[in-house]
Amino acid sequence: MAAVPPLRDRLSFLHRLPILLKGTSDDDIPCPGYLFEEIAKISHESLGSSQCLLEYLLNRLDSSSGHVKLKVLKILLYLCSHGSSSFMLILRRNSALIQEATAFAGPPDPLHGNSLYQKVRAAAQDLGSTLFSDALPQPPSQPPQILPPAGMGAQARPHSALQGFGYTKESSRTGSAGETFLSTIQRAAEVVVNAVRPGPDNPCTKGPLPHGDAYQPAVTPSASHTHPNPGNLLPAAIQGTRAVKHQPGQAGGGWDEMDSSPSSQNSSCTSNLSRASDSVSRSGSDSHSGASREPGDLAERAEGMAPNDCQQELNLVRTVTQGPRVFLSREETQHFIKECGLLNCEAVLELLLQQLVGTSECEQMRALCAIASFGSADLLPQEHILLLCRQQLQELGAGSPGPVTNKATKILRHLEASCGQQFPTLRPCAQPNSAAAVVGPADLLTSPVPPPGSQVFLQPLSSTAVVPRSPVPTPSPDTLPPALQDPGELRTQLVCSSEPGTGSEQRLENTDTPKDSSSPCPWSPNSLFAGMELVACTRLPCPSFQADLQKVTTEPPVSEPSAFAFLNM
């Protein structure tokens, strides 16, 4: 071995000893790759560190364990190409243990046999051939690395500029700290002169000149670039300008930081645009909570939208309405609902209503299908959808008969039924000599309201006699119709209904139903299954009930109060 390494190198080597212990442990776990690099760095620190490293590795190589020998040989083989030249020179002078490892042998392992001994001998032969090879490139000698001093004010390299106020990192420039400080002051003076000097390129002189002796404060270049004049902005930049207003519950008291800037005086011009952009950004998160809002608030939000803010909604409506088929497929409907959840649902609904006017029948049908999907989704309240769509759907329903008219009427009835609104169900009398039509409860399927000025295609089979709440003498139970009697008595009359009816029964039937009505039971309630009874209801009450019924029908109908207070207004 060479001379004994100094004490400082030995103490420094003790800090790296845990790395070496982990890399040469006596187990079958391979040495991690990053430890090879850490061990190679030890050989480059100093000559004493290389001597200590080689001494430790040779001591571990002299161990009787095959796992330790194999790990040490692999580390030495890595250091032949990545270690320092001084380490390679010392290793060549102390290669006796490497020669002994080429003949390493022992009792075979019960499980692995002689495989470990063979690996150690092969690694020792590779290390010897690499170590004494003539073609081995000599690694460049690296000077010992000087660790940078730690502490306040320490510099990573000598003769560097002082770090602090006015410090600029320039690796190419060299000079004293005084020269660096003077150059910093000179550059700052140039910036101030360029900002104050009038010129065509000065951004401060692009504004209007002061009139008379009016005071105009100087504006630094950073402030002018930060707050440009809104009049010179592009439309896209104007749309992104936020309005300055108080927002309760926000950080900083809810006031924007632009209140003290020169551009805050123009904030009132962009308040509508910012309100529209806020409504668009909140449509995805507030869509599911819209049922708790009033329709009036939603209408005010819809009025504050600008046309330029609805470009994504317009593209979605064009994609939905322009398709090869008349109806929307399930995939198209699901994609439409998903996109609406991310956009402004109110704007999409208004654009769909605009597509119902002046477009082809196919586009109208696809737009109606999209509107119908709003009714089945939880994007907007049903009351708000009905408020926006009622006028357009009524105009379409009043048009010429066709699929568009039927679809619009169906959607309107569905929305009215979902909102619980009672729409009128009065029908004109079929005969001029008959009594007034009896008012029955609203039935969505059997009593549709025909559009004004159009022909009635579907008519209810019969009207239901409902006695309103009025001070009219109640008929006796013997004269009540089957619809108003007890269910047990009605069942008894149906069993005994084989008797022929009288002339008065026929007259009463004519006063209640139209001539073309073929219902066998005029007193049955309006139902989808009317006319499908197995037993004909031909037994009618006594003639004395006709006079009482006429008295009842002459009184104005009194609607039953609803359980919802807002429907009784």
From Swiss-Prot:
Residues 260-292 have a biased composition (Low complexity). Residues 559-569 are annotated as: Interaction with AP4E1. It is found in: Golgi apparatus, trans-Golgi network membrane; Cytoplasmic vesicle; Cytoplasm, Cytosol. It is a peripheral membrane protein. The keyword Phosphoprotein applies. One of its GO terms (cellular component) is organelle membrane. Residues 525-535 are annotated as: Interaction with AP4B1. The modification Phosphoserine is found at residue 400. Residues 219-229, 494-505 have a biased composition (Polar residues). The keyword Phosphoprotein applies. Keywords: Cytoplasm, Cytoplasmic vesicle, Golgi apparatus, Membrane, Phosphoprotein. Residues 506-515 have a biased composition (Basic and acidic residues). Pfam families: ENTH. One of its GO terms (molecular function) is protein-containing complex binding. Residues 8-141 form the ENTH domain. Residues 196-298, 467-524 are annotated as: Disordered. Residues 470-480 have a biased composition (Pro residues). Interacts with AP4B1 and AP4E1; the interaction is direct and mediates the association of TEPSIN with the adapter-like complex 4 (AP-4), a heterotetramer composed of AP4B1, AP4E1, AP4M1 and AP4S1. Associates with the adapter-like complex 4 (AP-4) and may therefore play a role in vesicular trafficking of proteins at the trans-Golgi network. PANTHER family: AP-4 COMPLEX ACCESSORY SUBUNIT TEPSIN. This is AP-4 complex accessory subunit Tepsin. It comes from Rattus norvegicus (Rat).
